[in-house]
Amino acid sequence: MTSATSIRAVAVAPLDIPLHVPFGISGGAQAMANNVLVTLELADGTRGYGEAAPLPPYNGETQAMALAALRTAQAWLPGRDAAEWRALAAEFSARGGAGCGSAQCALEMALLDAVTKRRGEPLWKFFGGASTTLETDMTVTTGTVAEAADAARAIRARGIRQIKVKVGGAGGPAGDLARVAAIYAAAPDAPLILDGNAGISRAAASELVRGLRAAGITPALLEQWLAKDDLAGAAALIAESGWRVAADETACTADDARRIAAAGAAQVVNIKLMKSGVIAAWELATAARAAGLGLMIGGNVESMLAMSVSACFATGIGGFEFADLDTPWFMATNPFDGGFAVTGGMISVAGITAGHGVVPKE
């Protein structure tokens, strides 16, 4: 007899969402979220949804790569039991999904959504139910000094307390300093996270630290300024600045967390489900915590679907000091209903009663 959790169908489709403004990081910018939606339908009609959000300037992954990886699952996943989600995720990885972390993430999201939705369990409880609220920042992407100041004022007008600033742009340290100073003047009480996306050299990092110190600006966090493999440089940046440093591109697996801690290369790791999938992110969070590293939850340019999974993940596990779950607000349209609620910068998942709570609009 067919199990109620047997997978009946797998649908994979592009998910293209225009942005209000280009989302720029040190490696480039994009004006459209070119993502992928995967839908799993179980034998009893339950549907689970997952999102791949590849970000070419971040790690080189593209929508075409995610589509190709997920479409391979259409050949072997039907007839398999979604209740065996961990084994199915491992099989997808072994069949090539591991080559595209955002695709791995999308499949795992869809599996977990279907399984927890069917049994009436919210995903935040599945992850541990530690809490239901989380405070997010909002990002000022790369751009001009005037645009940075305007964005900072708009962020504070939304009631958001923390501001993340993309640095490492074409203007070099002087350009970064001018933008950060303008943001600081516009929102002097806002904790600032300065994110280099691995695009700043050691020399430029030292110059920017000196400039910030001279301007009287003390960031709350320096996020991945240096190349992802430069652990010694990151440790030196901590010593030189005296400020806290977060690893992002460097931290993709549990082994990465242990290497970072051993090298003294960061005090915080930014966990993104899109890097290697939900399961790998869970293992990374466990290893980071065991190594004494603080936790941050972030993402790529993701819709409410993927961001709600990240919110469930972070609130359910608990102990996340920083959160950067703002990209749904950069999108000109929202193709989904449901997900987390937000007031100012405070996210609540309490209203999610089964799965991640997000469904495509009719």
Question: Where are the predicted features?
Answer:
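Catalytic domains of carbohydrate-active enzymes, especially glycoside hydrolases
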Residues: 155-166
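Metal- or metallocofactor-binding catalytic centers and their adjacent structured scaffolds
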Residues: 41-118
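N-terminal small/glycine-rich loop or linker at the start of catalytic domains
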Residues: 117-142
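Flexible C-terminal active-site loop/helix
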Residues: 2, 8-19, 35, 301-362
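Conserved, mostly hydrophobic/aromatic
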Residues: 7, 38, 45, 107, ...
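Catalytic core of soluble alpha/beta enzymes
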Residues: 167-308, 332-342
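Structured beta-strand/loop patches that form or line metal/cofactor-binding pockets in enzymes
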Residues: 2-44, 48, 52-58, 333-336
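Active-site beta->alpha loop and helix N-cap motifs at the rims of alpha/beta catalytic domains
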Residues: 121, 138-150, 154, 173-176
